[in-house]
Amino acid sequence: MAILSIDQGTSGTKALIVSAEGAVLAKGFAPVELTYLAGGGVECDAELLWQSVITAAAMAHGNWDGGKQGIEAVALANQGESVLAWDPDSMRALSPMIIWQDSRSASLCDARLEYADLVRMRTGLTLDPYFVAPKMAWLRENVTRAGVVTTSDAWMIARLAGAFVTDVATASRSLVFDIHRQCWDSELLDIWGLGAERLPTVVANAGIVGSIACADLKFLRDVPLAGLIVDQPAALFAQSCLVPGQTKCTYGTGAFLLANIGAAPRMSTHGLVTSIAWNMRGESAYYYDGQVFTAGSAVQWLVECGLLAGVHEIDALPRDARGIVASPGFAGYGAPRWQPRGTASIAGLSLASTRQELARAVVDGVAAQVAELIGAMGADAVPVQRLRVDGGLTQCRTLMQAQADLAQVPIDVYPHPDATAIGAAALARLALHPALRPADAIPVWRAQQTYEPEWSSDRAQEFLHRWRMVAKHTLNAPDG
């Protein structure tokens, strides 16, 4: 029996059919078009996003010769911090989907700085528009007060199976969820003016929440919906990061560094945030999280500016940017700087500089941001000895070697391009088979390739020093 695992991501929706052994039997994909607005807005048409879910699932099913083998369950991974308003009766979207990169609610965070310590101690998070509650409050103030306002997963689950729920990992990204008691926090909700909102019930990650009843997915009717989780901890699970200290980084639209820190929450003192990775069978795992908001989207900017023809050209870039240093914070900065109004900056250009060298500097800048996060992990007593990586950009040898050089750790490339969907499928299998151990639900994997550092530690530190000097000039840019 197979799992149909849906990964609803920033740039599109993937659907995989995954066998009991973890083999990917079929795939489907449908893109999602984002709109970038003045003032830091990033959104998409929510109904078109939903159609991408239907299209990807139908495509995967259509590409699969199941024979006698049926679909045992549907799993769902979501973006985590993307928000919309919707009608709980008709299921119709009442607003665009406000994407996790959106920073228009920065001023709402500024107005609540007096609560920063309280928020941090209860939620593990920093007051930043990246997280859910500021977007919810901004949407209520600026778009509509009708319907309910939730993260994207609650809406998709309601449309798939009729249940009004969210999973504990997603809830922990909200700024209004107590990660110690694992419940919504009424005081924090009031701080954001959300005390009267109807919120979804919070459920464990490896449980069954209902059966598919969506008219657009008749071929899945009555199949259990199980295995609900945020995309990043799903990838952490897929890469078998089950022991404290094990760390992964996913390189997609952004780059996200997560380290398992065990069964109890710990607060970072170096700018990282703490969230719930998963709760299953009454036991939880927590993680430290650091974010680079523009990784794949920085490469896409290079393409749109004509500096690259496509991602495939990255590995043809020169080995050195000849003094150009880039801090590609096109959507602001997450950990450890937390500067939503920060911008990108490039230094060291001359008349002799080439477009290839500029592109190389941007690629190195992405790796430098991740290296800075790895340093913060070490300062928080979670030293990264090896880094497991996944996502589309891991196929770029130039970026991965730069990452090994700047972070000064070996890089193990996960062999599948769809770690998030594989992780969600493993959680669904745990929901269906109570006797199955978590480690046995995860497909065994070996690194597709390992990158060892070629630079000396001194050379890496010298580069990171120059990069930090450039990054400092990008912070606190004026609104506009």
What are the functions of these language-model segments?
Residues M1-S95, M121, R145, K218-G227, ...:
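N-terminal glycine/serine-rich phosphate-binding loop of ATP-dependent small-molecule kinases
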Residues L4-I6, D110-T166, L175-S186, D190-I191, ...:
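Active-site core segments that coordinate phosphate-bearing ligands/cofactors
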Residues A15-I17, G22, V74, D102, ...:
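Conserved small-residue
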Residues A30, T35, I98-S105, A171, ...:
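Short, acidic/turn-prone active-site loops that include or flank metal/cofactor-
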Residues G62-W100, R122, T126-Y130, A137, ...:
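Short beta-strand-loop/turn "lid" adjacent to the catalytic site in phosphate-handling enzymes
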Residues L199-I208, I314-P318:
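Short linear loop/turn motifs
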